[in-house]
């Protein structure tokens, strides 16, 4: 028996999985099911490409009083991965550089302020769901110079971890492991 309440709750996921990219963005004509990319619209003749979405991530090293180096991570307050640890980051907005996006996401998710000019490229990875992860590295900061952690609209807290551990997404776990292996 179909649970109507469950169907309504899960409707956005069903719609997203079945209807996303199902119609031409130029004229609205439906594509044939399982059309390959790039898609040529039979209605208007326009070609549509499915390009990756750029995501900026940032590694902020932190040195504690004992001389141990760690990284700032956030505990996610939104899905996917609610309650799990992640690196600060998010989608790059139109009109901003990846460095600007990295420090904006750091500020939005932790309240920590950084200068975009200080961000250096650490690595680039292809993520799941069609993303391209551009990971920046900031200069290390002293733990004593950082303000206390406060929840934000997207995170429950920020904290410093001193070694690799599982994060909300495999690509983030790999980036963290790569950082600690190179530090």
Regions from the PLM with identified roles:
Residues 62, 66-108:
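Conserved Nudix-box catalytic region and its N-terminal flanking loop in Nudix hydrolases
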Residues 13-57:
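Acidic, metal-coordinating catalytic segment for phosphate/diphosphate chemistry
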Residues 3-4:
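Compositionally biased, low-complexity intrinsically disordered regions
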Residues 60-61, 73, 138, 160:
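Conserved hydrophobic "DFG−1" position in protein kinase catalytic cores
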Residues 46-51, 64, 78, 123-135:
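Acidic pyrophosphate-coordinating catalytic loop
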Residues 57, 71-75, 135:
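Beta-strand scaffold of nucleotide-dependent catalytic cores
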Residues 92-182:
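Unchanged
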């Amino acid at each position: 028996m179909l649970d109507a309440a469950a169907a309504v709750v899960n409707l956005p996921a069903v719609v997203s999985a079945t209807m996303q990219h199902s119609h031409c963005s130029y004229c609205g004509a439906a594509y044939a099911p399982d059309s390959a990319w790039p898609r040529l619209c039979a209605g208007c003749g326009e070609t549509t490409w499915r390009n990756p979405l750029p995501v900026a991530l940032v590694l902020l090293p932190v040195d504690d009083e004992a001389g141990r180096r760690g990284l700032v991570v956030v505990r996610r307050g939104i899905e996917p991965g609610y309650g799990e640890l992640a690196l600060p980051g998010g989608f790059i907005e139109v009109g901003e550089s990846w460095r600007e996006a990295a420090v904006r996401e750091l500020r939005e998710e932790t309240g920590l302020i950084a200068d975009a000019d200080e961000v250096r490229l650490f690595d680039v990875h292809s993520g799941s769901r069609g993303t391209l992860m551009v990971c920046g590295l900031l200069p290390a900061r002293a733990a004593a110079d950082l303000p206390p952690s406060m929840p934000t609209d997207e995170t429950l807290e920020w904290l410093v971890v001193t070694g690799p551990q599982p994060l909300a997404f495999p690509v983030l776990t790999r980036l963290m492991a790569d950082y600690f292996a190179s530090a």
